[in-house]
Amino acid sequence: MSRNLTPEPVVTGIVETRIGQLRWREYGGSREAAGDKTLLFVHGLLTNSDVWGEVVQDLSQDFWCITLDIPLGSHTIPAREDASLTVAELAQAVNEAAEQLCPHGFTLIGSDTGGVVSQLAAVQEPAGLKRLVLLSCDTEKNFLPLPLRYLQYVAYIPGTMQALRAALHLGWVRRLPIAFGWLVKRELDAAEWNSIIAPLKDAGVRRDLAKVLKGIST
């Protein structure tokens, strides 16, 4: 998570995909930028585009940067109620968004769970994909990572996502290795935590998170 929330985007919008609407933001550059100058960012579990704050602030001076919010628990637009939120479906949705948002090609950048989504998106060989950049991320045989793997199973218990939301309001819980303790290098400020936790107030967002987690364990 960056020290500051993302800078003001040049343009924001919503793109339609097979799983529903995805919110996107763009920074710097131009939609007419060549594929090697277009960067598409995919975040991880229980984060959203705000995780890329300082990254897009720096890179948007030389690149056209697009951040995409996918339904991993801190998104603000719930997926379609009938959407299958397997990682493969998320990857398809990313490629559908890229086709519409990156007409001249793109470099796909994924971190954490977004890295797995990006790997599967690349395997589908979208026409516009120029490069794949994987930051610290999950892999097929380490997904979810062991400290967080319990989430794949407790997601089957009714009310767990609501309980997770309540627990994440407690600082000592957030600092546990089975929460964010090993994922952040410093204590996030109130605005950053709010960006992560507040979307879970929406029952649709909680439903989506549970679907994704159940999909991992199948």
Regions found by a protein language model. Name each.
Residues 2, 8-9, 22-24, 30, ...:
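Flexible "cap/lid" subdomain of the alpha/beta-hydrolase fold that forms the substrate-access gate
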Residues 60-65:
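A generic structural motif
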Residues 11-17:
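Short acidic-hydrophobic surface loop/beta-edge motif
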Residues 44-56:
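The serine-hydrolase catalytic nucleophile loop
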Residues 35-44:
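Short beta-strand element of the alpha/beta-hydrolase
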Residues 36, 53, 187-190:
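Non-catalytic, surface-exposed connector residues within folded enzymatic/regulatory domains
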Residues 55-58, 97:
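Alpha-helical interaction/dimerization surfaces of two-component signaling modules
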